[in-house]
Every structure is written in C-alpha cells, then in structure tokens.
C-alpha cells in the first residue's frame, strides 16, 4: 500500500475515533461545557453540551476537503511546488498535513470532555507539540518549494 493510502486510512480512523469518543461521552456531560481556551489552556468560554458536536463536524469537513484536494493535484487553489503536483505526492503531503490536524481535534475534544467531567482543570501543552508537528510538515513543503524555485532559476 502506498504512503498516501496509509495516511488516508490513519486519518479516517482518527475521524471515526473522534466521533465515537464524542458519542460515547455525550450523555454523561454536564449541561455546560468548556468551548474555548486561552493561550495558557485555561477556560475562557463555555456553552451548552450540544456544542461538543462542533469539533467533530469541523474535523469531518476538513477530512472531505483534504480528500477532494488530493484528487485534483492540478488545482490552482493549491500553492505547492510543481514537484508535488503528482497525485501520489500531493496525497502524501495533504494527508501528512491532515494527520496533525486530526490529532489536534482529537486532543482538544478529549481534553475538553475531561475538563467538563472535572478530571483535569485546563488544556495540557500537547496542543503546542501537535502544532509544532504541523509546522514541520508545512516547513518541509516550503523548503522543497524554495529549493525547486532555485533550481528552476538556475536552469533558465
């Protein structure tokens, strides 16, 4: 199986876990749950427990969006190096970028529910590590793009 296929399956599995965990925990949630956190992970916004469905819905939308993008590597909406415009490469890049996004959604949902259940008091620093992974993926694409641009200029 190709790398992009494996990444797609892992991302799809994470989406199923996000929905399953939310469904399992929903009935036991208090009527008001944390919905927003400040930079330090402390709660600065709350809403009714129905708002817990927002993050799984956004994660699902992002999954469909990334899947659609991976199917059209020539899209003018993609700002990627020409070397990424092959279907296999764009799939690896897009699904590599989606992976930390899905992990981030899962972490925020799990931690929000744990805070609502009073099992922890604030978000952990895991969010920052996950964002770091996402920036590494973006940075890798950027470095490849810059190198490709320099090679094209030297060939002209």
Label every PLM stretch briefly:
Residues 12-22:
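Single-pass alpha-helical transmembrane signal-anchor segments
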Residues 105-156:
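Alpha-helical transmembrane segments of multi-pass integral membrane proteins
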Residues 1-14, 88-91:
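Alpha-helical transmembrane segments and their helix-start/interface "positive-inside/aromatic belt" motifs
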Residues 7-8, 65-69, 91-103:
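Select subsegments of transmembrane alpha-helices in polytopic membrane proteins
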Residues 11-13, 46-63, 127-136:
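Alpha-helical transmembrane segments
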Residues 24-28, 61-77, 143-149:
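Membrane-water interface of transmembrane alpha-helices
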Residues 72-94:
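Cytoplasmic juxtamembrane regions at transmembrane-helix boundaries
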Residues 22-53:
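Active-site and channel-lining beta-strand-loop segments
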């Amino acid at each position: 199986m190709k790398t992009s296929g494996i990444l797609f399956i892992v991302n799809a599995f994470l989406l199923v876990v996000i929905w399953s965990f939310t469904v399992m925990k929903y009935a036991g949630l208090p009527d008001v749950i944390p919905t927003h956190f400040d930079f330090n992970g402390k709660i600065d916004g709350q809403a009714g427990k129905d708002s817990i469905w927002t993050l799984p819905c956004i994660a699902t939308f992002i999954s469909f969006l990334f899947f659609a993008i991976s199917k059209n590597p020539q899209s003018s909406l993609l700002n990627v190096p020409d070397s990424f415009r092959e279907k296999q490469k764009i799939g690896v890049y897009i699904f590599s970028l989606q992976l930390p996004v899905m992990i981030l959604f899962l972490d925020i949902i799990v931690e929000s529910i744990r805070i609502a259940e009073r099992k922890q008091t604030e978000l952990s620093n895991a969010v920052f590590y996950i964002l770091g992974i996402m920036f590494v993926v973006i940075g890798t694409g950027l470095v490849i793009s810059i190198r490709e641009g320099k090679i094209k200029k030297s060939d002209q």
